[in-house]
């Protein structure tokens, strides 16, 4: 793994649904991926993972050891439902408790990075108070993460509050904590009116991982690779030239497809071809 120039992973929701992590990691290995990113979204099923028993957590660790496929990151999108910026104190408290549990879970199973959704609120109307509560919630969250040595990394979103690296850097400077970094999504970044290459260069010292997907203006999910607006080769070239050596994660939602593995293999080959054109050579 450490000899590979490009650590390449796949999002959990790209693979067949289910709770057997040994099978999921075995499939990811068969498909040639180095790691899988876990999803803890707003559904009760995936939220319940944060209450796994010691035995369930150990089963995940054992699956990682057995397959050699890591689970180094978690996409924590549960805060759509329980936002840190909520003006309802009970909802906000639930959001902070989810954060605490996620950090503890990460510490237990070896997850290094928790990707955060940059929403002050999602299903409610945002205002100055929701943004203030969100900032305060992030500050409290980063304090918890610091004690656990777990990195919280902000995603560049499909939402105006956090739709550029420049905006996310504002939060990084505000929090001024090494355990808060950035996890850009080049699809989301490209779907807005951003100077994508400048944005990537500006954030390079704070980027801990990169989501890879295609998008169109106003369409942030399920755009087939090559049918959107993302200039993948330029993005990969910029990241390479800027000195980025971290992981790339192909983000897809093909878990309910007729043949998820075939969809993933097709996307993997497409992305790797663009990486090769950008001069990113895989080590054998």
Swiss-Prot record:
Pathway the protein contributes to: Cofactor degradation; L-ascorbate degradation; D-xylulose 5-phosphate from L-ascorbate: step 3/4
Induction: Induced by L-ascorbate. Repressed by UlaR.
GO molecular function, one term: intramolecular oxidoreductase activity, interconverting aldoses and ketoses
Alphabetically ordered keywords of this record: Isomerase
Enzyme Commission (EC) number: 5.1.3.22
One GO biological process term: L-ascorbic acid catabolic process
Pfam families tied to this protein: AP_endonuc_2
Reactions this protein catalyses: L-ribulose 5-phosphate = L-xylulose 5-phosphate
Family matches, as InterPro entries: L-Ru-5P_3-Epase, L-Ru-5P_3-Epase_Enterobacteria, Sugar_Epim/Isomerase, Xyl_isomerase-like_sf, Xyl_isomerase-like_TIM-brl
PANTHER family, per database record: ISOMERASE, L-RIBULOSE-5-PHOSPHATE 3-EPIMERASE ULAE
Function as written in the Swiss-Prot or TrEMBL entry: Catalyzes the isomerization of L-xylulose-5-phosphate to L-ribulose-5-phosphate. Is involved in the anaerobic L-ascorbate utilization.
Similarity comment: Belongs to the L-ribulose-5-phosphate 3-epimerase family.
Protein name stated in the entry: L-ribulose-5-phosphate 3-epimerase UlaE
The organism of origin for this protein: Escherichia coli (strain SMS-3-5 / SECEC)
Gene field: ulaE
């Amino acid at each position: 793994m450490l000899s590979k120039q490009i650590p390449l992973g796949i999002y959990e929701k790209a693979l067949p649904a289910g709770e057997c992590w040994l099978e999921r990691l075995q499939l990811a290995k068969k498909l040639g991926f180095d790691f899988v990113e876990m999803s803890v979204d707003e559904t009760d099923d995936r939220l319940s993972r944060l209450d796994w028993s010691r035995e369930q957590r150990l089963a995940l660790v054992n699956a990682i050891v057995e397959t050699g496929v890591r689970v180094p990151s978690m996409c924590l999108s549960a805060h759509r439902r329980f936002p840190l910026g909520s003006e309802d104190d009970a909802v906000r408290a639930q959001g902070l408790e989810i954060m605490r549990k996620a950090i503890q879970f990460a510490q237990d199973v070896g997850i290094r990075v928790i990707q955060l959704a940059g929403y002050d609120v999602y299903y409610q109307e945002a205002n100055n108070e929701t943004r203030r509560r969100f900032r305060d919630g992030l500050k409290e969250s980063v304090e918890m993460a610091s004690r656990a040595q777990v990195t919280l990394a902000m995603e560049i979103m499909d939402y105006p509050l956090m739709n550029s690296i420049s905006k996310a850097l504002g939060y990084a400077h505000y929090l001024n904590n090494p355990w808060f970094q950035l996890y850009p999504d080049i699809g989301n970044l490209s779907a807005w009116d951003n100077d994508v290459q400048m944005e990537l260069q500006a954030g390079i010292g704070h980027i801990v991982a990169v989501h890879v997907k295609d998008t169109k203006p106003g369409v942030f999910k399920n755009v087939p690779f090559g049918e959107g607006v993302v200039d993948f080769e330029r993005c990969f070239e910029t990241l390479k030239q800027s000195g980025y050596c971290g992981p790339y994660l192909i983000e897809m939602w093909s878990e309910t497809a007729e043949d998820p593995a075939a969809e993933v293999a097709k996307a993997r080959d497409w992305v790797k071809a663009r990486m090769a054109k950008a001069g990113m050579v895989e080590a054998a």
